[in-house]
Swiss-Prot record:
Entry binding sites for heme b: S51, K65, H69, K99, H104
Cystine pairs: none
Keywords carried by this UniProt record: Cytoplasm, Heme, Iron, Metal-binding, Nucleus, Oxidoreductase, Stress response
Name by which UniProt lists this protein: Anaerobic nitrite reductase MHB1
Localization annotation: Nucleus matrix; Cytoplasm
Enzyme Commission (EC) number: 1.7.2.-
Essential cofactor(s): heme b
Organism: Medicago sativa
Origin: domain of life: Eukaryota
Lineage summary: Eukaryota, Viridiplantae, Streptophyta, Embryophyta, Tracheophyta
Cofactor binding annotation: Binds 1 heme group per subunit.
BP GO terms, sorted: arbuscular mycorrhizal association; response to symbiotic fungus
Protein's job: Phytoglobin that reduces nitrite to nitric oxide (NO) under anoxic conditions (e.g. during flooding or in waterlogged soil) and upon root nodulation. Required for general plant development and during nodulation, especially for the onset of symbiosis. Monitors nitric oxide (NO) levels during early phase of the nitrogen-fixing symbiosis and buffers oxygen in functioning nodules. May not function as an oxygen storage or transport protein. Has an unusually high affinity for O(2) through a hexacoordinate heme iron because of a very low dissociation constant.
């Protein structure tokens, strides 16, 4: 498993992440797409990082490759957040972390892309569970996301 030590993710943060994820899980396809639409609204140039979007004339909402990609990113991000405290480390499927790191490296992802994604993720969650949203929940999801990003960055090198 891809792992990185997770200091600083508290029991309270875990509870907030789990509670909100349980409320969002059933809508993960729709929320994943919303996340990516927010990312591209904030940083339109980020579309160039995706081969299936580069020359596409199809509206983003109707792109058949964006939807499954967006859902898998949203699911992986949220599942990783939920597992963080239980496992004591960032956990994603076997070899995924190395692959994620290599892909993000290959496509030229930089810190700013991760920052835009974090902002878009927090906004997406806030809109998905407005009745639960609080500064503490924002911090919990922010911490979980930061730890996942640090784990991905630790693997950002050419694939061997």
């Amino acid at each position: 498993m891809g792992t990185l030590d997770t200091k600083g993710f508290t029991e309270e943060q875990e509870a907030l992440v789990v509670k909100s994820w349980n409320a969002m899980k059933k809508n993960s396809a729709e929320l994943g797409l919303k996340l990516f639409l927010k990312i591209f609204e904030i940083a339109p140039s980020a579309q160039k990082l995706f081969s299936f979007l580069k020359d596409s004339k199809v509206p983003l909402e109707q792109n058949t490759k964006l939807k499954p990609h967006a859902m898998s990113v949203f699911l992986m991000t949220c599942e990783s957040a939920v597992q963080l405290r239980k496992s004591g480390k960032v956990t994603v499927r076997e070899s995924s972390l190395k692959k994620l790191g290599a892909n993000h490296f290959k496509y030229g992802v930089v810190d700013e892309h991760f920052e835009v994604t974090k902002f878009a993720l927090l906004e997406t969650i806030k809109e998905a569970v407005p009745e639960m949203w609080s500064p503490a929940m924002k911090n919990a999801w922010g911490e979980a996301y930061d730890q996942l990003v640090n784990a991905i960055k630790s693997e950002m090198k050419p694939s061997s």
